[in-house]
Design a protein with these regions (language model features):
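A binding-site-centric feature that preferentially detects glycan-recognition modules on secreted/surface proteins
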Residues: 1-112, 118-189
Length: 189
């Protein structure tokens, strides 16, 4: 995986994570086959997750975020946590030519849409460890929903790296919107 692999030591160093014996045992085996890792080596990032919410990541690395504003009060930022497991998340994205529903319908049985906390965890780790941006200004839709402001339904959460503000920011993308989007994609394990 080369530069697209992060290990336990990277997570310990950059997040202050303590895995303990059970955590190390859980992460001892990478659940993806060698063939999958070879096929994904230029398009995905492999990393171990550690149980943190976006608000907890913000507390550890505030300079990397644009101000959270009201997002800190939404459940996607406050309650959702990264799982203690291996992740293989796509770092290259398909062109934004289809709607969320159209792209979601095309996911293979081995793919899923990750949560915003998982995307943020990966983006922060990539920046702190290698000074590499993952999203480069794109709005990447995640699996989380948040209550819309002007729209009565739930909206998809998007994550982006705001290059002007040098930080990670969030927003709402209405389910009523039919414009093309960039969908975050992860391999299931």
């Amino acid at each position: 995986m080369g530069n697209h692999f992060f290990g336990l030591e990277d997570v310990r160093h950059h997040y202050g994570a303590f895995f303990g014996g059970e955590g190390v045992a859980l992460l001892e085996h990478v659940p993806f086959s060698e063939a999958t890792l070879r096929a994904c080596r230029t398009t995905h990032i492999l990393f171990p997750g550690y149980p943190l919410s976006i608000t907890e990541m913000y507390a550890k690395c505030p300079k990397i975020f644009s101000p959270l504003g009201n997002a800190q009060f939404d459940s996607f930022a406050r309650d959702e946590r990264v799982d203690l497991r291996w992740y293989l998340i796509r770092r290259t994205y398909r062109p934004a030519t289809q709607t969320f529903a159209e792209q979601h319908a095309q996911l293979s049985c081995h793919e899923e849409v990750p949560l915003a906390c998982e995307m943020v965890f990966m983006a922060i780790l990539s920046w702190l460890a290698r000074k590499q941006r993952v999203f480069r200004g794109m709005r990447v839709l995640c699996d989380d929903l948040m209550r819309g402001i002007s729209d009565p339904g739930d909206c998809r959460v998007f994550v982006q790296e705001d290059e002007r503000k040098q930080g990670i920011s969030f927003g709402r993308f209405s389910h009523l919107c039919n414009e093309p989007v960039v969908l975050a994609i992860a391999r299931k394990n």
